[in-house]
Regions:
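Short terminal alpha-helical segments
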Residues: 1-31, 92
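Position-driven detector of the extreme protein N-terminus
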Residues: 2-5, 65, 84
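Structural helix-adjacent loops and short alpha-helical linkers that scaffold large soluble proteins
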Residues: 3-5, 46-53, 103-106
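Short amphipathic alpha-helical segments that mediate assembly, nucleic-acid/protein binding
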Residues: 9-13, 35, 51-57, 72, ...
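Generic structural signal for hydrophobic core residues of well-folded globular domains
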Residues: 16, 20-23, 39-46, 63, ...
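Active-site nucleophilic cysteine motif
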Residues: 30-41
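Amphipathic protein-protein interaction modules
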Residues: 46-80
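Amphipathic alpha-helical binding modules
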Residues: 67-116
């Protein structure tokens, strides 16, 4: 997966995080589908290719799964069940951190990625 991370992913996720934070309702909730909408809007605003947006969505879904979300793809398409915006922001922040680690690899991290 490391070779499939678009250069624009970090910026897309940061803009998405800001948008989701702003659009949360008064109860501090949002729909998972709103995260996908915000991803798409961020990508369009940055002028990136649709494939880069989809790859960034895949990174987010994998991050969500690593944080315990059983069906992240379904959550990102859901417009009926609200989730706490804190949960959405945690997913987005973790994805940003993960991409940041890829952009600034530490000594020895390549071997741990290859073996894992």
């Amino acid at each position: 997966m490391t070779n499939m991370v678009p250069a624009s992913s970090s910026e897309i996720l940061k803009r998405t995080l800001d948008t989701v934070r702003i659009r949360a309702n008064s109860n501090g909730e949002c729909f998972g589908g709103e995260i996908t909408d915000a991803l798409r809007e961020a990508g369009v605003a940055l002028g990136v290719d649709r494939l880069e947006i989809l790859l960034t969505r895949t990174i987010l879904a994998r991050t969500m799964e690593s944080l315990g979300e059983s069906y992240p793809a379904e959550v990102l398409q859901d417009y009926q069940n609200r989730m706490p915006v804190s949960k959405a922001l945690r997913y987005l922040n973790e994805a940003i951190v993960w991409i940041g680690k890829l952009e600034t690899p530490e000594v020895g991290s390549l071997s741990s990625v290859c073996s894992g």
